[in-house]
């Protein structure tokens, strides 16, 4: 009851769950007939936006088509009920019937599965936080000197990620943090600073990477970065002889090696670390199940830092629900240019022009040809085509000494075209290489294409990626989707969008396995993530809430005013939907004011209906925070209805009563009615917003 709850002076803590909504449930890129999920009605097909007028009040609605050609009109103020459908191939996407009970049954079953998954995830989490780890001590002076020798300026996201990692390491609970950022965005510097802190605390560091070439590159970079410090850094890969490997292993075991970088070889059983304190895993998804089990064995009770440019669903699941800590690096280094991507049918003319353009400006070229048996023939073919180029080949079947020599020569610009397999896919960083040509790009996965494209554009020069396919007409459906996706995802910090598109193309079943994914395909990945996060919250708090409570916690705001961005203000539908989505997923007033400024800057002063839209979003935010269930109002007054378990600051509410004593009265135990003659809608909305702010303060 409200009267009882008024006595409780506890303030409600409002959590920021925007991460999943902004990156997984982004509606702004919807296309006509694309599948979409409504929480209460199921999976339909998006049909665009339309303006609906009721009693001279205009609102814009999302139109969703359901089975039997039924249509549902969803006001943009209820966008929180909608999410993109991600889950299975196009032909298998469900289409529900309005008014049919099947959707509720599927949703209920998925919710039960979400609770099962949440229990497993929380068990992992509770095991981790119950472990006693090492609390790293700060070494201010040394650390400051180390940081000052970094030759670049940190981006804000880099700085934030580093601070989060160090904060984790200072705690006695073992760190388990994922740093997610696009290729070339500075994840390695985060790892280096964590490594430095560990070494200062006399702890050993293991850096696990998926490929020999990446291990060699990390070894070179770490050696250069630590050259002013007495830090012993070694590398363990197939580039070393057996004798050298045994020598390194022995030195690790007795503590003479401080940092060991390597492939899966660093998981060998005969490695007995003397004082391992930090494990850094680069591109975790590249390791198989067996290697991941070995990682678990060596990572017990130590801090673990994982770096990735291509997050996978399970990793995202654990990060989004708070089981793993997550840092995102989404801002590029200064002067970094977006890689220009072109799709062309295989053409010798295109290849010659692309190679010549690059080498004539003093640059270098990767030519990806993923058929090792014929790669020598391809080199000869390209040499005839572009005699001006100095061409060599590189692939994983070469002797380790030969491959190391080739990559070293390429790095030092001793030749300018490398015809290679996907061995260069992960992490190789050669700033002078600014053109990549991928032959038979239709045969590569989306994440692979993204990683390969990330090998170029590592400097201030404009970089180019050429995706060559045998035929644009005959390309298979899924391959076309991958090619279309990689060309459309050109913006910086697009790793989350990449993960979503990969889910859309491959389907949940292929990525998570059919046993785990059946219930997800029926409701979509976006909604499943909401159910999972809700389940985790409820289990943590020790209760089970009904399914509908997920939505019922959102207050209903009915103020009888037009609140929309009219097409006379923003003409393009998807631009309006973009801003509607941004407003709907904002979690604080500052974000909403930034949206207001962006709108004014790009489209001019907001019309009244746009101003009301943003203010109503603020009213909804603060109403949710203080436990308001519904607000209904017109020009003569209205009422505020509270949830029974609302926790309101009684003193602040009494202050509001005293300001306008004749304005208020309770008409039920949970409903507070107000009577007031407002001059206009603007005054009324401002009054309601300010009143809620005063109650909350």
UniProtKB/Swiss-Prot annotation:
Q: Which Pfam families does the record associate with it?
A: CarD_TRCF_RID, DEAD, Helicase_C, TRCF
A GO cellular-component term linked to this record: cytoplasm
InterPro entries, alphabetized: CarD-like/TRCF_RID (IPR003711), CarD-like/TRCF_RID_sf (IPR036101), DEAD/DEAH_box_helicase_dom (IPR011545), Helicase_ATP-bd (IPR014001), Helicase_C-like (IPR001650), Mfd (IPR004576), P-loop_NTPase (IPR027417), RecG/Mfd (IPR047112)
Q: Which UniProt keywords apply?
A: ATP-binding, Cytoplasm, DNA damage, DNA repair, DNA-binding, Helicase, Hydrolase, Nucleotide-binding
Q: What role does this protein play? A: Couples transcription and DNA repair by recognizing RNA polymerase (RNAP) stalled at DNA lesions. Mediates ATP-dependent release of RNAP and its truncated transcript from the DNA, and recruitment of nucleotide excision repair machinery to the damaged site.
Q: Where is this motif: DEEH box?
A: 282-285
Question: Where, in this chain's numbering, is ATP bound?
Answer: 181-188
Q: Name one GO biological process term.
A: DNA repair
Give the enzyme's EC designation. Answer: 3.6.4.-
GO-annotated molecular function: ATP binding; damaged DNA binding; DNA helicase activity; hydrolase activity
User: What protein name does the entry list?
Assistant: Transcription-repair-coupling factor
**Residues in Helicase ATP-binding domain copies:** 168-329
Q: Which family does it belong to?
A: In the N-terminal section; belongs to the UvrB family.
Q: What class of enzyme is it?
A: hydrolase
Localization, per the record, is: Cytoplasm
Organism, by scientific name, is Buchnera aphidicola subsp. Baizongia pistaciae (strain Bp)
Provide the taxonomic classification: Bacteria, Pseudomonadati, Pseudomonadota, Gammaproteobacteria, Enterobacterales
Chain ranges of the Helicase C-terminal domain: 350-504
């Amino acid at each position: 009851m409200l009267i009882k709850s008024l006595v409780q002076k506890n303030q409600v803590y409002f959590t920021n769950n925007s991460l999943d909504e902004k990156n997984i449930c982004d509606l702004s890129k919807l296309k006509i007939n694309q599948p979409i999920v409504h929480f209460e009605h199921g999976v339909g097909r998006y049909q665009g936006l339309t303006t609906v007028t009721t009693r001279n009040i205009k609102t814009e609605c999302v139109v969703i088509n359901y089975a039997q050609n039924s249509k549902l009109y969803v006001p943009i103020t209820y966008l929180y009920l909608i999410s993109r459908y991600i889950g299975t191939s196009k032909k298998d996407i469900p289409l529900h019937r309005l008014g049919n009970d099947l959707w509720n049954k599927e949703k209920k079953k998925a919710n039960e599965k979400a609770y099962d998954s949440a229990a497993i995830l929380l068990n992992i989490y509770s095991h981790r936080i119950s472990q006693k780890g090492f609390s790293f001590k700060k070494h201010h002076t040394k650390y400051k000197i180390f940081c000052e020798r970094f030759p670049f300026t940190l981006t804000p996201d880099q700085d934030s990620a580093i601070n989060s990692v160090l904060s984790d390491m200072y705690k006695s609970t073992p760190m388990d943090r994922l740093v997610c950022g696009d290729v070339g965005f500075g994840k390695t510097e985060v790892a280096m600073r964590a490594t430095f802190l560990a070494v200062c605390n006399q702890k050993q560091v293991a850096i696990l990477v998926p490929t020999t070439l990446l291990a060699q590159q990390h070894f070179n970079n770490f050696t250069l970065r630590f050259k002013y410090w007495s830090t012993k850094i070694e590398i363990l890969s197939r580039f070393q002889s057996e004798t050298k490997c045994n020598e390194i292993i022995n030195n690790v075991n007795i503590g003479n090696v401080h940092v060991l970088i390597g492939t899966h070889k660093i998981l060998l059983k005969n490695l007995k670390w003397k004082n391992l304190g930090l494990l850094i895993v680069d591109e975790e998804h590249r390791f198989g199940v067996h290697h991941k089990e070995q990682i678990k064995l060596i990572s017990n009770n130590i801090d673990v830092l994982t770096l990735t440019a291509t997050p996978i669903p399970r990793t995202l699941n654990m990060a989004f629900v708070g089981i793993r800590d997550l840092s995102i690096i989404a801002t590029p280094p200064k002067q970094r240019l977006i890689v220009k991507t072109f799709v062309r049918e295989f053409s010798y003319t295109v290849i010659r022009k692309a190679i010549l353009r690059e080498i004539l400006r003093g640059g270098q070229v990767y030519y990806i040809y993923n058929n090792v048996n014929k790669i020598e023939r391809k080199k000869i073919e390209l040499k005839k085509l572009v005699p001006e180029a100095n061409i060599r080949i590189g692939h994983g079947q070469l002797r380790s000494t030969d491959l190391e020599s080739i990559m070293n020569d390429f790095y030092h610009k001793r030749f300018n075209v490398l015809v290679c397999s996907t061995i260069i896919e992960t992490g190789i960083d050669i700033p002078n290489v600014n053109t990549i040509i991928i032959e038979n790009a239709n045969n590569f996965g989306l994440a692979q294409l993204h990683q390969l494209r990330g090998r170029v554009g590592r400097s201030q020069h404009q970089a180019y990626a050429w995706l060559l396919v045998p035929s644009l007409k005959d390309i298979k459906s899924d391959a076309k989707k991958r090619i279309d996706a990689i060309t459309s995802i050109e913006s910086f910090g697009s790793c989350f969008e990449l993960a979503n598109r990969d889910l859309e193309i491959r389907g949940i079943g292929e990525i998570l396995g059919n046993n785990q994914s059946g219930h997800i395909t029926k409701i979509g990945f976006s909604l499943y993530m909401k159910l999972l996060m809700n389940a985790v919250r409820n289990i943590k708090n020790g209760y089970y809430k009904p399914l509908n409570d997920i939505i019922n916690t959102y207050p209903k705001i009915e103020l009888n005013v037009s609140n929309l961005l009219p097409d006379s203000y923003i003409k393009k539908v998807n631009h309006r939907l973009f801003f509607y989505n941004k407003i709907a997923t904002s979690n604080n007033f500052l974000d909403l004011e930034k949206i207001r400024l962006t709108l004014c800057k790009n489209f001019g002063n907001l019309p009244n209906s746009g101003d009301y839209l943003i203010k109503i979003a603020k009213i909804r935010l603060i109403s949710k925070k203080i436990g308001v269930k519904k607000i209904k109002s017109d020009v003569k007054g209205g009422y505020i209805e509270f949830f029974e378990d609302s926790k309101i600051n009684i003193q602040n509410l009494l202050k509001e009563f005293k300001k306008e004593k004749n304005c208020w009265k309770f008409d039920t135990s949970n409903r507070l009615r107000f009577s007031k003659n407002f001059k206009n809608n603007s005054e009324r909305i401002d009054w309601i917003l300010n009143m809620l702010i005063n109650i909350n303060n």
